[in-house]
UniProtKB/Swiss-Prot annotation:
Function (record text): Together with the chaperonin GroEL, plays an essential role in assisting protein folding. The GroEL-GroES system forms a nano-cage that allows encapsulation of the non-native substrate proteins and provides a physical environment optimized to promote and accelerate protein folding. GroES binds to the apical surface of the GroEL ring, thereby capping the opening of the GroEL channel.
Biological source species: Streptococcus mutans serotype c (strain ATCC 700610 / UA159)
Name used for this protein in its record: Co-chaperonin GroES
InterPro entries reported in the protein's UniProt record: Chaperonin_GroES (IPR020818), Chaperonin_GroES_sf (IPR037124), Chaprnonin_Cpn10_CS (IPR018369), GroES-like_sf (IPR011032)
CDD domains per UniProt: cpn10
SMART domains cross-referenced by the UniProt entry: Cpn10 (SM00883)
Cellular component per GO, a single term: cytoplasm
Family annotation (PROSITE patterns): CHAPERONINS_CPN10
GO biological process: chaperone cofactor-dependent protein refolding
UniProt xrefs under Pfam families: Cpn10
Keywords of the record: Chaperone, Cytoplasm
PANTHER family: 10 KDA HEAT SHOCK PROTEIN (PTHR10772), CO-CHAPERONIN GROES (PTHR10772:SF58)
Lineage: Bacteria, Bacillati, Bacillota, Bacilli, Lactobacillales
Domain of life of the native organism: Bacteria
Family: Belongs to the GroES chaperonin family.
Length: 95
């Protein structure tokens, strides 16, 4: 299992259903510019200039919303994941 450093977060993308309109699959450019992911692991947080640790506001299991272009793809226990910075998280989704 990966242990992210600092403000980094390991996430696994959630499968999204294909968007259709009247039975036609929408082209990639027409689809959402965001995607949902589940938090797999969270770094310890970041340090301020005075050395104080500011912990992450995310916890393992959170469902989050991120932009399509963020993250570094990695494999974790054979699963496709992304490593992102906490600042790249747009929102926490309450299911």
């Amino acid at each position: 299992m990966l242990k992210p450093l600092g403000d980094r977060v390991v996430v696994q993308l959630k499968e999204e259903k294909e968007q259709t309109v009247g039975g036609f699959v929408l082209a990639g450019a027409s689809q959402e510019k965001t995607k949902k992911a589940q938090v797999v692991a969270v770094g310890e947080g970041v340090r301020t200039l005075t050395g104080e640790l500011v912990a992450s506001s995310l916890v393992q299991g959170d469902t989050i919303l991120i932009e399509n272009h963020v993250g570094t793809p990695v494999k974790d226990d054979g699963k496709d994941c992304l490593i992102i910075r906490e600042a790249d998280v747009l929102a926490v989704v309450n299911d």
